[in-house]
A protein has these predicted regions:
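Bacterial N-terminal signal peptides that target proteins for export
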Residues: 2-12
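Glycan-processing catalytic domains of CAZymes
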Residues: 29-321
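C-terminal motif of bacterial Sec signal peptides marking the signal peptidase cleavage site
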Residues: 22-23
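Core hydrophobic alpha-helical transmembrane segments of single-pass membrane proteins
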Residues: 12-19
Length: 321
């Protein structure tokens, strides 16, 4: 999936995505559809391509039971079909390299399904922070593996997300000690060097990355005990900084339904209220204050499709009071 769908399909995408929010499962998905569609009518030509962050670890010990396995091809086919029905054109998948065999296998199966359904996938590479002395080599080796197995070779490679012909790789930092300049130099030797995108704007990394993406965050006020900080100031700062200071960098906006990690084994008791569906609707619309038909936002990332452990999943709809 690339810029070929940027104007027509992405306009349809945002239009179909603004529908989610009620009480039972069917009406919750209908509201999700409505929310996504209401957004599209405002600027029919420069809509961003809509993606969703995807977690591939369900069915593996250590994660909650959500009723399915991320390695079940039937589940993956259903998820792709449902995402497309909402106007989502691709999944950005948490990936740790081949050392995490369950997630790597799930990603491989998902890319196979995507390739047969005109759907895109991309890697969200989680930086390895377990062994600080080897994070740079790990990143280079893992990304080379991704290139050889998912981006450059095989029948499913056509499903890998591209922008202006180049593969897109998202990087999720974990406070490691990765030398991203070395990583950049390594991937630049590929026949088709990727676009590397880093979470949040970091002026120190402007020379090593092609752009930055937003991620769920409460904003300057931090995590409020009552969940009232829904991320408005964070998104305003991200879009303002990208348009004013880094207009030549690739920007990926974000939207989310809320956040609640109290079910996760690693919980830090962080809460962002769904505000009866307003958090998703407001975060989904906010980019329009900074982007338009003349200066379109390339991508909008929904955080997330199915992270039930952090309370950001839209797969089954978003709740309405």
């Amino acid at each position: 999936m690339n810029s070929r769908i940027f104007h027509l399909a992405s306009a349809l995408a945002l239009s179909s995505i603004l529908l989610v929010v009620v009480g039972c499962a069917g009406s919750r998905r209908a509201d999700l559809h409505q929310t996504l569609r209401q957004n599209e009518a405002r600027t029919p030509n420069g809509e961003p391509e809509v993606l969703a962050a995807y977690q591939p670890w369900f069915g593996r010990p250590g994660h909650i039971n959500v009723g399915y396995s991320s390695q079940d091809p039937a589940v993956l086919a259903r998820q792709v079909a449902e995402a497309k029905d909402l106007g989502i054109s691709g999944f950005v998948v948490n990936w740790y390299g081949p050392s995490h065999a369950f997630e790597d296998r799930a990603y491989s199966l998902l890319q196979d399904v995507a390739a047969g359904n005109d759907f895109a996938v991309a890697i969200l590479y989680d930086e390895n922070s377990d062994d600080p002395g080897h994070t740079t080599d790990d990143a280079i080796n893992d990304l080379n593996y991704a290139h050889d197995h998912y981006i450059a070779a095989g029948a499913s490679a056509r499903a890998y997300l591209r922008y202006n012909g180049r593969p897109v790789i998202f990087i999720f930092p974990k406070d490691g000690h990765t030398d991203w300049q070395r990583v950049r130099q390594a991937v630049n030797t590929w026949p088709d060097p990727p676009l590397l995108l880093y979470k949040d704007v970091d002026p120190r990394l402007v020379g090593d990355f092609d752009g930055f993406y937003a991620w769920v965050h409460p904003g300057r006020g931090g995590w409020a005990a009552d969940g009232s900080n829904w991320g408005q100031s964070y998104l305003e700062h991200f879009y303002s900084e990208m348009t004013s200071q880094y207009p030549d960098k690739l920007a990926v906006g974000a939207a989310w339904p809320g956040f609640d990690d109290r079910r996760a084994s690693w919980s830090r008791n962080r809460l962002m209220s769904a505000r009866c569906g307003k958090t998703f609707a407001d975060s989904l619309h906010l980019f329009r204050r900074y982007y338009n038909d003349q200066r379109p936002l390339p991508f909008l990332l929904i955080v997330t499709w199915n992270d039930y452990e952090e309370g950001t999943a839209i797969e089954r709809g978003t709740g309405k009071c």
